[in-house]
Amino acid sequence: MKIKALAKLKPEVGIWMTTVDKPEPGHNDLLIKIHKTAICGTDIHIYNWDEWSQNTIPVPMVVGHEYVGEVVGMGQEVRGFSVGDRVSGEGHITCGHCRNCRAGRTHLCRNTIGVGVNRTGAFAEYLVIPAFNAFKIPAGISDDLASIFDPFGNAVHSALSFDVVGEDVLITGAGPIGIMAAAVAKHAGARYVVITDINEYRLDLARKMGVTRAVNVAQQKLEDVIAQLGMTEGFDVGLEMSGAPVAFNSMLKNMSHGGKIALLGIPPSDMSIDWNMVIFKGLVIKGIYGREMFETWYKMASLIQSGLDLDPIITHTFPVDKFQEGFDMMRSGKSGKVILDWSI
């Protein structure tokens, strides 16, 4: 049986609609009928066929890793799931036998394989993944929200890496993950949550999500905002989401002594920073990759169930046959999360 899929078919700019064989689940796998998928920044890198993509993505391959769907089949060894379960899933498939996996730190597996990056992805009518990677979506959480659990998980992992209760938090980079991280920090009890960017559309989205201040650093100095808020010692927690050297250096400059930074944005490999600030301020910098399995996933569901409203971050939905419009919208920078509906 042939099914529809979006794939990287050629080593050039673009994503293409194609048909592929319907996948068959192995002994420990789930077969998921995809309802909705979301376009990730990684998918845009793949679309643009940048240097990272050229060195990483096998061609041809079905891409995509943000999704929600319904279990329609499973392998004979699977336990804990039933046909009809609504699921999303962890996009990092881990080996299970390295030291970190065996110690319960699976998000630090050195042999991680990415769904839609190193193996067949979720931009298709059906997806097969290991049952271990699937997460049941609680009733009351919409398909739209469930489809963005992967990037929401990056935001939660970053925002909750350090204690933010009563603290002042700076987020550099108002992409969807940065905006969601800001909302999580505010929901979790931070005092001031300030986010910076140069994209006014996304700064407006951040304002809708309840940040204290959304600062266009092309028009306003972060130091002026700090003074207006009456802050005297800098930010306690920093979440670097942009990968922009100028943003990270600004963060270092405006951190309090003893401040803690979660680093999710991927900077150029030759980025230069003032290490004197790190040393003499006693700053802590923690690299963030993916989501903690599966602590972050349970926190995601609980945050939404406790009233965290992520609806404003989803700005556009397209039927999958209009996927090109969705990718164009994401590439324009004039969107939050863009969803492709496979049920239409």
Curated annotation (Swiss-Prot):
Q: Does the keyword Oxidoreductase apply?
A: yes
Give the EC number(s) listed in the UniProt record: 1.1.1.103
Q: Which reaction does it catalyse?
A: L-threonine + NAD(+) = (2S)-2-amino-3-oxobutanoate + NADH + H(+)
Where NAD(+) binds, per the record, is at I177, D197, R202, L264, G265, I266, I288, Y289
Q: Under the cellular component aspect of Gene Ontology, which terms does the record hold?
A: cytoplasm
Which residues are recorded as binding Zn(2+) 1?
C40, H65, E66
SUPFAM superfamilies reported for this sequence: GroES-like (SSF50129), NAD(P)-binding Rossmann-fold domains (SSF51735)
At the top of the EC hierarchy, this enzyme's class is: oxidoreductase
Q: Where is this site: Important for catalytic activity for the proton relay mechanism but does not participate directly in the coordination of zinc atom?
A: D150
Recorded superkingdom = Bacteria
- Subunit organization: Homotetramer.
Family statement drawn from the similarity comment of this UniProt entry = Belongs to the zinc-containing alcohol dehydrogenase family.
Q: What does this protein do?
A: Catalyzes the NAD(+)-dependent oxidation of L-threonine to 2-amino-3-ketobutyrate.
Question: Which protein are we looking at?
Answer: L-threonine 3-dehydrogenase
Write down the species.
Psychromonas ingrahamii (strain DSM 17664 / CCUG 51855 / 37)
Gene behind this protein: tdh
